[in-house]
Amino acid sequence: GCNVIIDYVSEVSGTEQEKNALLGQATLLRGFYHLKLAMIYCQAYTASGVDPKTALGVPLMLTMDLTDDYPERPSLEALYSQIEQDFLTATSLLEENYTPDNVYRVGSVAAYVLLSRFYLFRGGDEDLDKAIQYAGMAIEKGPMLSRLSMLMGTDKSIYDSDMSSEVVWCYGGYSFKVNTYFPTDAYQSIVP
């Protein structure tokens, strides 16, 4: 998905601004997916006893080309360097070329949030300052806090992107009614 867009965006019709907006969105999502995989399948970057130069990351898929060869696993350092590069490139492209019209598209505010989370997760001393910087940029440019008393009437509460101004980006989807616990007093009669 993301690599197809990145590899072929120059060949599609549209203005340079539209192409750069697509490139920014695809690059941000590629970095996001690599980060999600790293969070699940890799050792923590700054964990005790972990050397990012020798610890293995997840395979970096940077092109849409498929081969029969198994992809190699780069070092954790190389993986995180590529994720950071994707996020920074995407942030620059999105700041200059695109403002999303709904919460299901990524824009520069989502890029700031993801960069902040990336730096927190990587966790180096210099990374924490960058996490604060990008979180501040997200807060400055992003949505205002919602009044919680206005949201409690919905099943989804603060997660309702139609009601809450705090939602920066939504991806995936599932029913809140199926996955939410609703307390009940139906079993009170069992207790004497």
Pin down the residues of each PLM region:
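"A position-specific structural signal for the A-helix of alpha-solenoid helical repeats
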Residues: L22, L29, K36, G107-V109, ...
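Aromatic-residue-lined binding/catalytic grooves and analogous aromatic/hydrophobic interfacial grooves
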Residues: V109, L114-L145
